Amino acid sequence: MVPQTETKAGAGFKAGVKDYRLTYYTPDYVVRDTDILAAFRMTPQLGVPPEECGAAVAAESSTGTWTTVWTDGLTSLDRYKGRCYDIEPVPGEDNQYIAYVAYPIDLFEEGSVTNMFTSIVGNVFGFKALRALRLEDLRIPPAYVKTFVGPPHGIQVERDKLNKYGRGLLGCTIKPKLGLSAKNYGRAVYECLRGGLDFTKDDENVNSQPFMRWRDRFLFVAEAIYKAQAETGEVKGHYLNATAGTCEEMMKRAVCAKELGVPIIMHDYLTGGFTANTSLAIYCRDNGLLLHIHRAMHAVIDRQRNHGIHFRVLAKALRMSGGDHLHSGTVVGKLEGEREVTLGFVDLMRDDYVEKDRSRGIYFTQDWCSMPGVMPVASGGIHVWHMPALVEIFGDDACLQFGGGTLGHPWGNAPGAAANRVALEACTQARNEGRDLAREGGDVIRSACKWSPELAAACEVWKEIKFEFDTIDKL
């Protein structure tokens, strides 16, 4: 039997557990241009110093583990470790801090949102020393941005494909979201597009259920698109949801959409996953399809103020993974969304360069290096009376999506679409003439009603509908 040898301290290894602060809390660190920066809102367990928690976040999301290990000596931890370089208390909150962590770019695989998130928002969110942890923002350095393909086409190319300029785009989610046959579904699509909408949409739950298999839906919808285009002389589209149980099935549906000649398909990027989304985005770029992205499941991740991931991070991740549209909330509808916060991440979706602005929740300056922008989609509980606010908030580069606000019109689907189109064009013209939509929007809509009986009927139906609930996630 070989006798056990004693480990000498001079050999460079000492077993045991040491404070994360000794290695991963580095307040003197000078951030590099190539570092990925993260801002975490952390709530330590009672009695745990914030410096220890910040260091633990940096360690557990990069090179650290709970004890000293032999193999630390086989690499350069100083080169690869994450560093908590600053901690600041959250104003007005007890025992909450913003911890800033810098990650060397070499920790992440090029062009992989999946790998980036696996590290930064992985096991660390279950760490016992933390009562709660939320990723508020990420700074993606240009060196890493350039490894991503990004949106298949972007806002300008989409406008060129559609030949639609100078106004926002109009959409509608077909309702009821589940239960229609494929033929009746196609009929609703046709009526909405003929009435004046640019797009109609599959609901995020619509995949290939027994009442309507995907191939039947695709065929009837394609027929509706071509018929509406022939009658109106405008390019029309429908977001055909290609999301499926496997990537192979998803790609089969995308190929079918391409063969039918439709302009746009759709994916549920959070439930479908970033790997599937990036694969689909690359296919769409190579084959001339626009890609509409729905954010189903986002509120499970982003709605709680103290724990999870803020939507601005999910929006940045989608821009890197690839998508031409992304649902972003409405500010004025039925879904969660504070105005300044929403406008902050809308700018992060659309603009090429966004300055740090804590008043809008933007913790870092972000340079997208000419990566195409993503068009925000405002959807959820909106109707014609919201149109002035939507035009004022989002401007032209947005898709305004009225589901119930189209299909709930008392005269039917086509009149509902016409009402929305008249309201949009009236508000756009009023804005272009210098009128203040925030103050005069109601007058603009009432004036347009004189020339559009469809709009007048819609205004009468929804004149008392409001969604006045306080926003949970505030700055």
From Swiss-Prot:
N6-carboxylysine found at: 201
In terms of superkingdom, the source organism counts as Eukaryota
Q: Which residues carry this modification: S-methylcysteine?
A: 256, 369
Q: Which residues bind substrate?
A: 123, 173, 177, 295, 327, 379
Keywords tagged on the record: Acetylation, Calvin cycle, Carbon dioxide fixation, Chloroplast, Disulfide bond, Hydroxylation, Lyase, Magnesium, Metal-binding, Methylation, Monooxygenase, Oxidoreductase, Photorespiration, Photosynthesis, Plastid
User: Could you say which residues bind Mg(2+) here?
Assistant: 201, 203-204
Q: Which CDD domains match?
A: RuBisCO_large_I
Task: Give all 4-hydroxyproline modified positions.
Answer: 104, 151
Q: Where is this site: Transition state stabilizer?
A: 334
Q: Which cofactor does it need?
A: Mg(2+)
* Outcome (variant: residue 46 to P): In strain: 137c and CC-503
Describe cofactor binding as the record notes it.
Binds 1 Mg(2+) ion per subunit.
User: Which GO terms of type biological process are on file?
Assistant: photorespiration; reductive pentose-phosphate cycle
User: A GO CC term?
Assistant: chloroplast
InterPro entries to which the protein is assigned, alphabetical: RuBisCO (IPR033966), RuBisCo_large_chain_AS (IPR020878), RuBisCO_lsu_C (IPR000685), RuBisCO_lsu_C_sf (IPR036376), RuBisCO_lsu_fd_N (IPR017443), RuBisCO_lsu_N_sf (IPR036422), RuBisCO_lsuI (IPR020888)
Q: Which GO terms describe its molecular function?
A: magnesium ion binding; monooxygenase activity; ribulose-bisphosphate carboxylase activity
Positions where N-acetylproline occurs in the chain: 3
What positions belong to the pro-peptide in this record?
1-2
Cited function? RuBisCO catalyzes two reactions: the carboxylation of D-ribulose 1,5-bisphosphate, the primary event in carbon dioxide fixation, as well as the oxidative fragmentation of the pentose substrate in the photorespiration process. Both reactions occur simultaneously and in competition at the same active site.
What is the additional note?
The basic functional RuBisCO is composed of a large chain homodimer in a 'head-to-tail' conformation. In form I RuBisCO this homodimer is arranged in a barrel-like tetramer with the small subunits forming a tetrameric 'cap' on each end of the 'barrel'.
Q: How does this chain assemble? A: Heterohexadecamer of 8 large chains and 8 small chains; disulfide-linked. The disulfide link is formed within the large subunit homodimers.
Name the record gives this protein: Ribulose bisphosphate carboxylase large chain
Q: Tell me the organism.
A: Chlamydomonas reinhardtii
